[in-house]
């Protein structure tokens, strides 16, 4: 068992989640800005 390996894998999962979430967050932010005018 290698804690660093586990940590690395967790970090990759977090990074993947952030990368997938970023476009959605940007879209929502843009939609809100447009809605506010």
From Swiss-Prot:
Asked if ATP-binding is a keyword of the record, the answer is no
- InterPro entries xrefs: Cecropin
* Alphabetic keyword roster: Amidation, Antibiotic, Antimicrobial, Immunity, Innate immunity, Secreted
Q: Where are the transmembrane segments?
A: none
Which branch of life, at top level?
Answer: Eukaryota
Any idea which residues bear Glycine amide here? 37
| GO cellular component terms listed in the entry, alphabetical order | extracellular region
| GO annotation (BP), single | antibacterial humoral response
Pfam families xrefs: Cecropin (PF00272)
In its keyword annotation, does this UniProt entry include Secreted? yes
What does the UniProt entry say about where the protein is found?
A: Secreted
Similarity section:
Belongs to the cecropin family.
Function (record text): Cecropins have lytic and antibacterial activity against several Gram-positive and Gram-negative bacteria.
This chain's protein is named Bactericidin B-4
Species assigned in the record: Manduca sexta (Tobacco hawkmoth)
**Upper taxonomic classification of the species?**
Eukaryota, Metazoa, Ecdysozoa, Arthropoda, Hexapoda
